[in-house]
């Protein structure tokens, strides 16, 4: 009985892992979405409003990143966001821009648009590297 239970747990763990993986189709869709976000975000307000969408895409791709890439981006993001805690626990969605409260000041807009530009470029670069490495012939 113990062996059967262990096998069932192992099978469930394997299925959950495979189902939650970041597929090539999801990567391609997110890559196209990031490119569209960057291309169509011309003014400061649009860039500020689309930061959350970039963060959502990053959160989807983060488990697939190399530890060094993930640590670098996590550090960059945490410097520009803060966790919203309720009774000491992060809410779903977890973070918000520090600058949102001051979004009307020119300095805050500069910080937010700089964050948007850097985050978007970092995510786009990761997608480019993923697709480049998957299309290069093996030696």
From Swiss-Prot:
The keyword Secreted applies. GO terms for biological process: cellular response to heat; cellular response to UV; innate immune response; response to bacterium; response to heat; response to UV. GO terms for cellular component: extracellular space. The keyword Secreted applies. It comes from the Eukaryota. Belongs to the Turandot family. A humoral factor that may play a role in stress tolerance. This is Protein Turandot B. It comes from Drosophila yakuba (Fruit fly). The lineage of its organism: Eukaryota, Metazoa, Ecdysozoa, Arthropoda, Hexapoda. The gene is TotB.
